[in-house]
A protein has these predicted regions:
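Acidic, Ser/Thr/Gly/Pro-rich intrinsically disordered interaction regions
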Residues: 1-35, 53-133
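Extended, well-ordered alpha-helical segments in internal regulatory regions
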Residues: 38, 43-52, 80
Length: 133
């Protein structure tokens, strides 16, 4: 057993953390859990770049619209003001006083965070399989 505080040392461990954050987000959809998921899901890439030896072209292939939305949500939560111009925005609305809907918006395209999170987890799992991680 390790007694280090931050002991995530591999891409697999970071993906497993993202899955735990995803489960928390699905069971209790709120800004804290949304923030934690997107920060973790985005930073899976850091571990891939530093320790996995995956071909840079495969890594570059992950940078699609979904991953850029993830990057936006991660950075939007971490920084008071984004220094990079982005086409994305975030939106939350309580429908009829009921549940709050959280979305990432790209122009006229609105993506619920739960849907985006599900797509990201599936893409990461596929990426890991295809690259032997």
């Amino acid at each position: 057993m390790s007694y280090e505080f931050f002991d995530i040392s591999s891409p697999k461990e970071m993906l497993e953390k993202a899955k735990r954050e995803y489960a928390r987000m699905k069971s209790d959809l709120n800004t804290d859990n949304i923030f934690n998921f997107f920060v973790t899901a985005y930073h899976v890439m850091d571990h891939i770049k530093t320790v996995s030896g995956v071909d840079p072209k495969a890594i570059q292939g992950m940078y699609d619209d979904d991953f850029r939305m993830c990057q936006f949500a991660c950075n939007k939560g971490k920084h008071a003001i984004l220094k990079t111009i982005t086409p994305y925005s975030s939106f939350a609305d309580s429908v009829g006083g009921g549940e709050t809907i959280y979305e990432v918006v790209d122009g006229s395209k609105r993506v619920r965070v739960e849907y985006l999170a599900d797509k990201l987890i599936n893409k990461w799992e596929k990426f890991f399989r295809e690259n032997g991680i």
